[in-house]
Curated annotation (Swiss-Prot):
Name this polypeptide is given: Tyrosine--tRNA ligase
Subcellular localization, as worded in the UniProt entry: Cytoplasm
Residue window of motif 'HIGH' region: 44-53
Organism, as annotated: Nitrobacter winogradskyi (strain ATCC 25391 / DSM 10237 / CIP 104748 / NCIMB 11846 / Nb-255)
Gene: tyrS
UniProt entry keywords in alphabetical sequence: Aminoacyl-tRNA synthetase, ATP-binding, Cytoplasm, Ligase, Nucleotide-binding, Protein biosynthesis, RNA-binding
Keyword flag Chaperone: no
Binding site for ATP: K239
Length: 417
């Protein structure tokens, strides 16, 4: 490990956030003598951010905790274009109303991790639509576009991958990297920003911003990326059988979020405690050292602490209690995720495949059939043996619900409405 002078870089390194930096020595010197103002951008492509965004959010959290100033940049402008990074097809163009609605929906996530206000190191939230929508096209070409080499842009991974696969790359997407670079320059001018952080897939775009700042005469700018989120087995994190692990409780119940962290691989527990909780490093070391069945206790701590950061301590403890009631006592907890089903639908017989899909426990009827063959789906703790099974009021428990389960840890209660 490198011995940095600044608390900021030492903290990020100790907890495993650092992947690449444009100039470690220069950034460390700056952070050790002055306040760093850093930003991370978030496009508004969905009503919620997901677990994949957490690394960069936690980087901003530790930036602020070490006395520096974070900027959460909403991509109200860039979302109108669409980031081609990591995409093998053109993003769907969203309406302006949908982008605005998504932006409002994700704003609250940052309030859980950052302190906003007018203080010296209080966080700022801004939207690149403020300047991107006011740009004059001809002036943009003359003042900004002339600094970009098509030759270099064609070597960017996001562009090269699409071209090599002979997949269409629209002109509007090709311009995304120019807009992101300009964001950096604009934030440097408006807020004295001197660092952009993001995932390693954004490295090329961020470095382009550093270079554009130099060419346009801003102060020295820096780039810092975190690794992409993967499990110890190399699988990309952030997805379950039911879809993305959303951060908004309206899109993923708190209990499911808790269970996501409870179910991580044993080898990932120590690393994820460093990245996704604010527990002291000494306590993390003790938890990471647990072996055998004891590692499950560390997983419960990870799940509760990660959930508490996002949804609050009370909700995290409630999720932990629900898991304890469900698994250790074998009871049906009222805190399990619920799905209302019309009484008329149940009375006429509801197909089990469609109900498991509707409950979010599987992604499709085909997956439900595969799970049934493997004994993975249960109704009221009894394995489903027939994919043509229908549920009726006869399946209601004394509590007036039907318990759907996939595996041992994922449950949804059907409640007649």
């Amino acid at each position: 490990m490198v011995a940095f002078k600044s608390d900021f870089l030492n903290t990020l390194q100790e907890r495993g956030f650092i992947h690449q930096c444009s100039d470690f020595e220069g950034l460390d010197a700056l952070a050790s003598r002055n306040q760093v103002t850093a930003y991370t951008g978030y496009d508004c492509t969905a009503p919620s951010l997901h677990v994949g965004h957490l690394l960069s959010i936690m980087m901003m959290h530790w930036l602020q905790q070490t006395g520096n100033k974070p900027i959460a940049l909403m991509g109200g402008g860039t979302t109108r274009v669409g980031d081609p990074s990591g995409r093998d097809e053109t993003r769907k163009i969203l309406s302006y109303d949908q982008i605005d609605a998504n932006k409002e929906s994700i704003k609250g996530t940052f309030l859980k991790f950052l302190v906003f206000g007018d203080g010296k190191n209080d966080a700022i939230m801004t939207d690149n639509a403020e300047w991107l929508t006011r740009l004059n096209y001809i002036e943009m070409l003359r003042d900004v576009g002339r600094h970009f080499s098509i030759n270099r842009m064609l070597t960017m991974d996001s562009v090269k991958m699409r071209l090599e696969r002979e997949q269409e790359l629209s002109f509007i997407e090709f311009n995304y990297m120019i807009l992101q670079s300009y964001d950096y320059v604009e934030l440097a001018r408006r807020h004295g920003c001197n660092l952009q952080m993001g995932g390693s897939d954004q490295w090329g775009n961020i470095v382009n911003g550093v270079d554009l700042g130099r060419r346009m005469g801003t102060h020295q700018l820096y780039a810092l990326t975190c690794p992409l989120l993967t499990t110890s087995s190399g699988a990309k994190m952030g997805k379950t059988a039911a879809g993305a692990v959303w951060l908004n409780a309206t899109m993923l119940p708190v209990y499911d979020y808790w269970q996501y962290w409870r179910n991580v691989e044993d080898a990932d527990v120590g690393r994820f405690l460093k990245l996704f909780t604010i527990l002291p490093m000494g306590e993390i070391a003790k938890l990471a050292a647990l072996q055998g069945s004891e590692i499950n206790e560390a997983k419960k701590v990870l799940a509760t602490e990660a959930t508490a950061l996002l949804h609050g301590r009370d909700e995290a403890e409630k999720a932990a209690d629900t898991a304890r009631t469900t698994f250790e006592q074998g009871a049906i907890s009222e805190s399990l995720p619920t799905l209302d089903i019309p009484r008329s639908e149940l009375a006429s017989g509801a197909g089990v495949l469609a109900l498991f899909v509707k409950a979010g426990l599987v992604a499709s009827n085909g997956e439900a059939r595969r799970q049934i063959k493997g004994g993975g789906l249960r109704v009221n703790d009894v394995a489903v043996a027939d994919d043509k099974m229908v549920l009726t009021p006869d399946h209601l428990t004394p509590e007036g619900v039907i318990k759907l389960s996939m595996g041992k840890k994922r449950h949804v209660l059907l409640r007649p409405a």
